[in-house]
Amino acid sequence: MALDSMREIFDRMAEEGKPFWEIVLETDMEERQVTRNQSMAKMLTMWQAMSDAADGYTGRRRSVSGLVGGDGMKMRQYNLRGEAMTGGYVSEVIAEALSMAESNACMGRIVAAPTAGACGVLPAVLLPLCKYEELSQHQLLEALYVASGIGAVIAYRACIAGASGGCQAEIGTASAMAAGALVALRGGDGQQIGHAVAMALKNLMGLVCDPVAGLVEVPCVKRNVIGAVNAVSVADMAMAGITSQVPVDEVIDAMGEVGRRMPVEFRETALGGLAATPTGVAIQEKMRKSS
């Protein structure tokens, strides 16, 4: 998607008098040479896949390694008992993030947003919101366009893969996408979307990618939670009028620079961080012997 800066989107919004989501929609139409209806039908497929993944989660499946599985259901049950300190919407965001990320680890069908490893963040903030607010299908699709536009800019200016820029590039980008989508759903303007994106990325800048045994399981599943909760927090801050002192495009560029300078041990190689702990090494050795 040919969007190379958030500033470009903001300028087009001002010049054309169109909302953020529509600028992204029209860019998709131009890039893929599709009609408006075709573009929206494709986005609806993405939303339905997210919803189906959530509905299909039972908590009974475990990953092949046995490292993850069932935590999403534990959180759901904890919420139902009324014991969650966060309560309400945020506690459901946590449960959904765990459930979706576990589904990926257990070979379920998910939507990479922007990657499979970060697939739990965006649906985690959107799906529970449908229970608390009356959101039309069109509003949800608009939010997904906002998220995809943000992801496209970050992919162009920085990176979205853990192997390229660490977990900040995956979970950080997913969190920024989710934050922008939430602000759009709450009626925020382009500048508020930009501030939410900037704050989301700043909060997770420098986060390394250190998967135990090289699997997208530990700590990846639980990091989807922090990405989702971070998105909710910064969306609220942006809607409250709190701003990022560093412009969003500069924040994106900084994240890219941090990623490029990050040692290879912290970019999905399983050579550093949690993967290099005694327990991490032991798990990897156990899996090697059993394969």
Question: What function would you assign to each model-found segment?
Answer:
Residues 1-108, 131-132, 241, 248-291:
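Generic N-terminal targeting/processing segments that precede catalytic cores or assembly contacts
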Residues 85, 112-119, 131, 136, ...:
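Glycine- and small hydrophobic-enriched segments that form the cores of compact globular domains
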Residues 87-104, 139-158, 203-211:
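Acidic-glycine-rich active-site phosphate/pyrophosphate-binding loop
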Residues 107-110, 160-166, 218:
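Active-site-adjacent structural elements in folded domains
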Residues 107-125, 169-174:
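Conserved phosphate/anionic-ligand binding catalytic regions in large, soluble enzymes, centered on
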Residues 123-134, 179-187:
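Alpha-helical support elements that line or immediately flank enzyme active sites
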Residues 155, 160-168, 174-175, 179, ...:
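N-terminal glycine-/lysine-enriched basic segments
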Residues 184-291:
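Functionally critical mobile loop/hinge segments
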